[in-house]
Structure formats: C-alpha cells, structure tokens
C-alpha cells in the first residue's frame, strides 16, 4: 500500500504573515487519519509524491512565522510554532520555525529512538562543540570553458558546482568571435573604475568582461558556490535540523543546518544491527562514520567517487583513445574507461579496389594516387628530356625511352639475357629504369630519363621515375635598390611618395593620389559593414570603421529573416535585405552559383554558367487570406512558410494515411483523420544541418529545385519549403490521380446542373453559415471536401485517400491526402571534405595546386604537374602553383581591361596580351607536356610582339564568335532533347583516354550525353480567401480561359 502525500499551500510574492494555520489543518487532518491507519500495519511505511502541480497548491494564509516547503517539495506550508508537533515519519508533521528546534522525547518504556517519532518545537540551545564535522558535497564531472585573457580556456573537472561560463568550446569561440567582430573603437572611451567585491564564504567571484560591442567591462559579481555548502554531521546525542532555506543570494547560498540536542538516551538497552565493512573500488573512498539519531549505533558507511580522478588518456602516435565503458558517477563506474587502439583511417575506393590510408596506386600510365584520410591525392610522373631522334613508350610505362636507329639485319640470331633467349627485335625490361632490345644478336640497353621539378620527389616501388607529391616553393628575397642619381625630386615634391619599378625600387616619378589610394586598398579581403577607415590623404585603408555612434536604435515592425538594409551612414533602416549572408569557405575557381532570386549560394559554378531564370519579386497571398511581403517568414500553425518571389513556400510534413472514405482535417490539427478518431498523430518536421530533400538530395541555403513535376522547393534556414499547385474542387466520391497529373481528377463526367425551366426552383444555395452560392458554383469548405450548388441544393463529396507503399508519406499544404515522393526523385550522394558538403560532380580547389572533384560520394583530387623550365633560377609567383622563369613573369596577369592615362591625360582601356595560364583540371584541360617542352627548348615560346598582332585580330573575331555561340545555345535550349559532346582527355605522352570513373570517353567515336530539358512550371492564380481559406469558381468556365493555370 502507498501513501500519496501532498502539501497544501504555496508562497506567493507579497504574501502576508501572522495569524493561525488557516485551512491547512483541515486538509492535513484527513491525511493524518489515513496515515494512522497505515502505520498500524507493519511493513507499510512508504511515501509516494504525486507529480507536482503548482496550480493545485493552496496559498498558506495568516502564518505566524515563515513558510516552508512541504515534504514533497512542491507546495508551501506554515512553519510549526512553539509546543506544536514536528518531524514524524517522513517529516509529515512539518518543520519548526526559526529559533525553534524539534525535540524528540525518549519513550517511557525505555525503547530506542527511531527516525519516525513525532517531536515538539522548543526554543533552541546551541553550542559549537556539538558539531562533529561536515559531509562532502555530491561532485559531478563538468566540462566547460571560460574566456581568460582573450582566449577560451576549457577543462573537465569534478566539482559540486559549474564554474564555467560556456558549456562547450564552440559556444565560447562563437562568443569570442562576436566580441572581436563587434569590438568598437575604444581609444576615447572612459570607463569607471570597477572594484572587485569581497565575496562571502558561500560564493565565488566572477570577474567582469566587456560584452560584445562595448568598451567598458561589466562589474565583477559574486555568485553562489555550491561547493561551499557543507551539511553538518553532529555529535552523538544531537540531530541535524534545517534552520533556514537558501535564498540563492551571496551570503544566503546554503541551507542552514544546526545540531539540535535530543534527550539523553540509555544505550545499554539498545541492540545495534551488525555493520558490514565496506570495501570501496579504486575510484572511490569510504565516507566518515555516522551515528544514529540517538547516538547509540553507527550507520553503514558508503563509497563516494574521488574528486579529480577522471581524465582523458594520452595515447602513443598511431593510436587513439576509444571508450570501453561509460561512467555514470557511481563507485566502480566513476569515470569513462578508455583503451588505446590503432587509429583507423578511412579508405579509398578506386576501380572497385579498396586502398588503405597511405597506400599508393596507379590511376593510369602517368598518374599515381596516394590515399590520405579517405581522399585520393593524385599526381603525375616526372619525365626527363630526351636527347635522341627516335624514342618509344614501353608498354605500361609513362616516360619514353630512346630507341637505337634502324640497322640492316645482318645476324637475325637471338640474344641471351637473364637466363632467357630473346628473339631479334624483342624488347624487355632489365630493371626499373633500364629497357633493352635485341638487335642482330646483341642486347642494346638504354636508361629512362627522369625529370625533377620538386625538392623532395617520392620513389614509387616498381617505377623508375619519382613523383612529386607537393610543389616546391621558392622564396625570393627583397631586391637591393640603388640610390636615385640625377633626380631633382624630393620627398616634399612627391607628397604621395615615389613610383616603384617592377623590382620594387623607386624611380624619379611621383605617385598620384589615385595610384596611392588604389595601392592601399588592393588585395584587401575584409568585409566591412560600416566601410573602411581613411588615412591622412583621405584614402581608404584595409581597416574597418567602427559602428557609428550616431545610429539610433531601429524601430521597425517588419520581420526580416536576412536583416535590415543600411543607409549611406551605415545605419539600419526599416527595409529588408533581399539576400542572406553567405558564410562559405569553399574556393571556387569559376565563382559561386546564384539562386533564382539572384542571391549567391555556397555552391561552385561550372565552367559554363547556366542561364538563370529572371528575378521575380512580389508579395504572397497565403491560403488563410493574409498577404505577406517578399522574403517574409511565418508559421501557419502546422508548418513553417516563407514568401519566395511571390510564391508561398511551406514545409512538407509527414502524416499517416487515414483508413476511411471521408477523412477530414479537424480544427487545430495538421494531418487528415477519420471523423471518429480522437487522437491525431502530430506531423513530423525534420531539422537537418543542410537541406535534405525527401528524395535523398542535399541542397544549400537559397537553392531552388523541382521535387517533382508539380512541386517547386527552396532551401531556407535548413528547411525544405515547397510550393504546390492549388487543386480545384473534386465533384465525385472516388477521384483518381494519374502519374502525369498534379491534382486528383474525377474518372467520370463531372456533374452538370439540370436545365429545368421551373421558375420556382431557386437559382442559388445557402449554407449553414449564411453564405450564398450561385447555381453551378463549386467550392471547397476544407481541403478534404468539395461542394457544388445544384438546383438550389448543396451536394458535397469527401475525398478518400488511397493507400501508400512508402514509410514516410508527405502532405502538401492545401491538399488532403499524403502521398509518396521517394520513388519520383533520383537519389544523389554528396561528398564531405574538410567539414564542407559538395554536390555530386562539383569541383573545387584546395589550393592553387590541388583540384578536387565529387563523384558519387567519392572525393578525387589531383595536383598540378609542372613542366621543367629552361632557366636556371625560376621564381614562384603568389597565387600560381608552378614556378616560372623571370623573363616570363608579368605582374598580375589578367585579361580584364585596365584603365591607363596617356601623356595627354586621357583614359584608355588596355587589354594585356599575355595569356593567363590555367591550372591543371581533372578532365577538361588538355596539356601536352612534350609539346610545351619542345617550344621552350627550341625557343619558339610566345613573344609579346607576336601576341600583339594576334590580339588585334582577336578584337574582331572574338565578338563574332561569341554572338554565334549565343545563337547556337538558344537553338539548343529550345529543343526537346539536347546532345552535348564531351571532349576527350589525352594523357601527357600518348593518345590514350582517361578511364578513372570520373568520365568515360570514347576517343574514336566520342561520347554523347543526353539532357532532357522539358520541364513544366505552373504559375497559380491567387486563391479566393472568402471561404475557409480556399477559392470559389464557376464549374462551367474554362480553366484555361480564366488563366487559372498557365504553362510557361
């Protein structure tokens, strides 16, 4: 049998004191009567507290003293006064007021005192020598961080309180970054001197720090330290009694206990139970010995976890810690148990072969790859220069070897080599670097010539020529400039400094102000919200302006998910930003893609930029009849919605399919259900880190796509929001939906009103709400019901939902039945690299030498192969992977027109005639190393004079070529099917094709990729919000004539 004990009364602010116990005694009498009945039966002592419901607590009125929490810790009650009963079983008789103690009188029959006696409240009499000691607090393993000296200091300690300001390193770093970003100009700030207060023993000092956007630190403060709250352990003959509850303020942080004496007890008649010796595990200790309330017997000791014991193990190189068992803070399981295991790194898969971390494999004849962290880093072999007229490439090799000239066959005998007889003309491999041929009975052997374009080449087992895994960087020291001679200009004459030559040395010419300002801001990558600072010459420098002081706090009732626009002073105005901020760490050689709204998204653009649809703007009319501005977000009670280019986009929710013929959506519910159902399953909303469409595809913020032929979706704030077609009323009981239709349709001929000439028949219908509908007018009172006015009578039809075969059917807003979309969308996989997500077939750059490609979830990377150079001391240019000869280097090579001022002061546009070298791409860039080496060896490289003449012809031919290409592109777009030829990739030294699971190309026949460009988009007219959020229409009207649906 259980006793449910509930205290009656709760303290409220401003509650008065004085008077008697109020109505609490009447309520307690019933409990005490029940308690007396229970205590009469042996073995029935138990207490079960009901769940706390503060609304059912009665406020204690006219209390003569303080109010205290009841035994269940839920409701407040009046403290017991002098000569009133206290204590008892489970403390049901209440606690004494301040200044009083609960005294338990010894039984008259000489029995021992137990913990269930009822005491009496008497005046306290206290001496410090009654204290035996303190119980330690209950420590927990806590992890967190604090900002100390501008850095995040993180630790894991076992303590009674949480001394950390931030729960994790990420939250601490975010706060530190926000402080740095919003750090104002504090050079003129005046802060008051803040003195640290002296904290009481029960609290600790928290030093103040400057919050984000402020210069002056907050004052230091004292906060309660639970580790200082120790419960007293009293001497024999004394009880530990709660005197006052903690208030949570420094100085009143701990519950105040005092040792109260009990009447002397004769322990000679007390028989103590045997106490077993406790053996604590190695991670814990045995607590102090405690006595019973009468001081006659000792209580069993217990084991507590040792403080500061848990930590993180340090493993040797090549091994990582792995959790064997989780600790729960109990003795024997105080800490997590770790073991050092060999570090398992992800493997690489290529051509159905699995390679472990560090393994090297051959991609083709000239390309090798090494598996590093699950990513294949690929590089090319380094072939040397041959000094012969005839050469060939041995089978399975990359680098060519010299071949002896053709001699007449004088002795067709064979050759004996390595224990085998080789026929005349046979070739064999003597070792990794030596290849031989039998000519006229004698073996003729030549060695492979290897090149070296890096300082630390890597030898591949079984290969002759080493490979370069990393490019070599050469540091160029600053030039030594000579003094200007025969120059009459001084520092005073050139107030904007002197001009510099290509070596960075002064020349006898003064800089203009424009040249000075351009040089100060060029190459600056800062994104300053309030503009750049200026120097003494009023030139912008690469430092951000602080937040302007004159900006007033914006008062705006608009909800802008992307923030507000700023005026010319850098202050926010009540207008919404069109595009969100795009935090993206990708390096995209062709720039970033844009969504249909013209906003940049974190996705690399392909080499040929696709034509983007025109930008559309406008407000949205929601199905509930409310108008929302563009880019506005709201919640309609079931799903999150967003106005995107004039279209209402709402989240797809997962609902079960109702098993009845007349489902409906009840008020306050989101999913359809049968009329007799009471409990309706709530819809499930997913919250992924990036948008994960139901079909399995991943999309980034701002990206728009078609989930099927009827639904267009966009990625907004990590949620997939979709716009769907509004379906007309269904005037039949069992509509069907075909695969090529977006809305259910009636299989039979729709209902038509009778052509009766009876004038007494009414020409309208009236529903229960008093709405008038004309004859033949149809409408939808809710998403599952369609009605029509027929001959003065309203006839309604309920839509029945067909069964589905998928596990998570989705429900579009404005429709009745959930349906499956997993089978209609092909699934795509993504690549995860360095904490970023890349789409399938997306390319990106790690640095100027390493290019990566995502193929079916596998990341493949390649490095640039640099050709040998004809100069002795090549230089390395910043931003370029391969070194180049000094005579080939032109600062900042570009094909963008540059403004230059001639000697007359006129501005001219000059296009530099140096071609910009492109880096090695995995597929599309063709590079013939032998051809390039031959040009440099023969001195037939590009010359500026030749390129100048070519560029003049290009100025005429390039616009014509571009115009023809644009015409061809538009003709191809208008076709139903497009056939796009993919060019062949050629290996550096022989005309073979690359077959590495990236793109398979047949060089002889060519590869044709079929693209289906037929996509249908539906533009929906605004629904009529007069009838329960849906529209009304004349059934006999032609839908196309009313422009209700338009195909674009």
From Swiss-Prot:
Residues 47-952 are extracellular. The chain crosses the membrane at residues 953-973. Residues 47-124 form the IGFBP N-terminal domain. A motif (Cell attachment site) lies at residues 326-328, 904-906. May play a role in CNS development by interacting with growth factors implicated in motor neuron differentiation and survival. This is Cysteine-rich motor neuron 1 protein. The gene is CRIM1. Residues 346-403, 413-469, 618-675, 689-747, 763-821, 829-886 form the VWFC domain. SUPFAM superfamilies: FnI-like domain (SSF57603), Growth factor receptor domain (SSF57184), Leech antihemostatic proteins (SSF57262). Residues 974-1048 are cytoplasmic. GO terms for cellular component: extracellular region; membrane. It is a single-pass type I membrane protein. Glycans are attached at residues 83, 486, 758, 913. Disulfide bonds join 49-72, 52-74, 57-75, 63-78, 86-102, 96-121. Residues 481-510, 517-544, 551-576, 579-604 form the Antistasin-like domain. It is found in: Membrane. Keywords: Disulfide bond, Glycoprotein, Membrane, Repeat, Signal, Transmembrane, Transmembrane helix. It comes from the Eukaryota. GO terms for molecular function: serine-type endopeptidase inhibitor activity.
């Amino acid at each position: 049998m259980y006793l449910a004990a509930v205290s009656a009364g709760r303290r409220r602010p401003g509650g008065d004191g004085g008077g008697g116990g109020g109505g609490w005694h009447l309520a307690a009498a019933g409990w005490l009567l029940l308690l007396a009945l229970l205590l009469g039966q042996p073995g029935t002592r138990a207490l079960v507290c009901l769940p706390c419901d503060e609304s059912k607590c009665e406020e204690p009125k006219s209390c003569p003293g303080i109010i205290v929490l009841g035994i269940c810790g839920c409701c407040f009650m009046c403290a017991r006064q002098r000569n009133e009963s206290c204590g008892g079983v489970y403390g049901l008789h209440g606690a004494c007021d301040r200044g009083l103690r609960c005294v338990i009188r010894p039984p008259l029959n000489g029995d021992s005192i137990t913990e269930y006696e009822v005491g009496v409240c008497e005046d306290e009499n206290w001496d410090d020598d009654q204290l035996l000691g303190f119980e330690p607090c209950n420590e927990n393993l806590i992890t967190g961080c604090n900002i100390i000296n501008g850095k995040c200091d993180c630790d894991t300690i076992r303590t009674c309180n949480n001394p950390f300001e931030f729960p994790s390193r990420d939250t601490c770093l975010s706060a530190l970054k926000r402080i740095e970003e919003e750090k104002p100009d504090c050079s003129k700030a005046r802060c008051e001197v803040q003195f640290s207060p002296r904290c009481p023993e029960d609290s600790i000092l928290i030093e103040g720090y400057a919050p984000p956007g402020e210069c002056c630190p907050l004052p230091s403060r004292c906060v309660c330290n639970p580790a200082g709250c120790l419960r007293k352990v009293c001497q024999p003959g004394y009880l530990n009694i709660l005197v006052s509850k903690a208030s949570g303020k420094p100085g009143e942080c701990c519950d105040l206990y005092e040792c109260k004496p009990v009447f002397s007890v004769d322990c000679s008649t007390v028989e103590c139970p045997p106490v077993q010796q406790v053996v604590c595990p190695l991670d814990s200790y045995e607590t102090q010995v405690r006595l019973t309330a009468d001081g006659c017997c000792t209580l069993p000791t217990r084991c507590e976890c040792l403080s500061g014991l848990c930590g993180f193990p340090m493993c040797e190189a090549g091994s990582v810690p792995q959790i064997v068992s989780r600790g729960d803070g109990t003795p024997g399981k105080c800490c997590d148990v770790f073991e050092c295991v060999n570090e398992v790194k992800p493997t690489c898969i290529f051509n159905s072969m699995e390679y472990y971390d560090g393994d090297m494999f051959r991609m083709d004849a000239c390309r090798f790859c090494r598996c590093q962290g699950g990513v294949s880093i690929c590089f090319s072999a380094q072939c040397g220069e041959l000094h012969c007229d005839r050469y060939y490439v041995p089978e399975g090799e990359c680098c060519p070897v010299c071949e002896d000239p053709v001699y007449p066959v004088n002795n067709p005998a064979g050759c004996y080599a390595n224990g085998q007889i080789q026929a005349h003309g046979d070739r064999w491999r003597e070792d990794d670097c030596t290849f031989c041929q039998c000519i006229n009975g004698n073996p003729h052997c030549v060695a492979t010539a290897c090149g070296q374009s890096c300082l630390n080449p890597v030898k591949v087992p079984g290969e002759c020529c080493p490979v370069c895994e990393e490019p070599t960087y050469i540091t160029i020291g600053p030039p030594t400039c000579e003094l200007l001679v025969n120059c009459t200009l001084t520092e005073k004459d050139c107030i904007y400094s002197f001009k510099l030559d290509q070596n960075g040395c002064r020349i006898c010419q003064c800089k203009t102000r424009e040249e000075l300002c351009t040089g100060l801001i060029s190459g600056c990558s800062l994104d300053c919200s309030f503009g750049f600072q200026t120097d003494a010459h009023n030139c912008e420098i690469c430092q951000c302006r602080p937040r302007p002081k004159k900006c007033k706090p914006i008062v705006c009732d608009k909800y802008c998910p992307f923030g507000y626009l700023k005026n010319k002073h850098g202050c926010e105005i009540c207008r919404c930003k069109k595009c969100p901020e795009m935090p993206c760490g990708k390096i995209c050689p062709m720039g970033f893609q844009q969504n249909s709204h013209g906003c940049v998204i974190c996705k690399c653009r392909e080499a040929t930029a696709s034509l983007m649809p025109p930008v559309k703007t406008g407000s949205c009319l929601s199905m509930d009849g409310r108008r929302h501005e563009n880019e506005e977000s709201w919640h309609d009670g079931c799903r999150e919605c967003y106005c995107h280019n004039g279209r209402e986009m709402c989240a797809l929710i997962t609902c079960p399919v109702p098993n009845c013929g007349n489902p409906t959506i009840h008020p306050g519910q989101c999913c359809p259900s049968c009329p007799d159902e009471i409990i309706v399953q709530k819809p499930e909303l997913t919250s992924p880190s990036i948008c994960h469409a139901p079909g399995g595809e991943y999309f980034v913020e701002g990206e728009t796509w078609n989930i099927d032929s009827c639904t267009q979706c966009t990625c907004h704030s990590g949620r997939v929001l979709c716009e769907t077609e509004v379906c007309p009323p269904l005037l039949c009981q069992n509509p069907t939906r075909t695969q090529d239709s977006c809305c259910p349709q009636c299989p039979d001929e729709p209902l038509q009103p009778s052509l009766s000439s009876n004038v007494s028949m009414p020409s309208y219908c009236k529903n229960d709400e008093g709405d008038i509908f004309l004859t033949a007018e149809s409408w939808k009172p809710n998403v599952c019901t369609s009605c029509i006015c027929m001959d003065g009578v309203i006839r309604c039809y309920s839509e029945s939902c067909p069964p589905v075969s998928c596990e998570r059917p989705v429900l579009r807003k404005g429709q009745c039945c959930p349906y499956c979309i997993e089978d209609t969308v092909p699934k795509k996989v993504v690549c995860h690299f360095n904490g970023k997500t890349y789409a399938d077939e997306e390319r990106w750059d790690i640095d100027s030498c390493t290019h990566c490609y995502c193929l079916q979830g596998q990341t493949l990377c390649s490095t640039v192969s640099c050709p040998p150079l004809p100069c002795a001391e090549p230089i390395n240019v910043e931003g370029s992977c391969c070194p180049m000869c000094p005579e080939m280097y032109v600062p900042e090579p570009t094909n963008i027109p540059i403004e230059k001022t001639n000697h007359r002061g006129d501005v001219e546009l000059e296009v530099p005639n140096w071609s910009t070298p492109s880096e090695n791409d995995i597929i599309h860039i063709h590079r013939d190393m032998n051809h390039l080496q031959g040009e440099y060896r023969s001195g037939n490289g590009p010359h500026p004079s030749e390129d100048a003449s070519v560029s003049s012809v290009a100025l005429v031919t390039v616009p014509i070529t571009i115009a023809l290409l644009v015409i061809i592109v538009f003709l191809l777009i208008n076709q139903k099917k497009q056939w796009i030829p993919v060019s062949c990739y050629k290996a550096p030294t022989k005309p073979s094709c690359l077959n590495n699971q990236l793109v398979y190309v047949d060089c002889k026949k060519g590869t044709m990729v079929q693209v289906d460009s037929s996509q249908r988009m539906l533009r929906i007219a605004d629904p009529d919000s007069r009838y329960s959020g849906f529209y009304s229409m004349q059934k006999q009207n032609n839908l196309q004539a009313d422009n209700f649906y338009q195909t674009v």
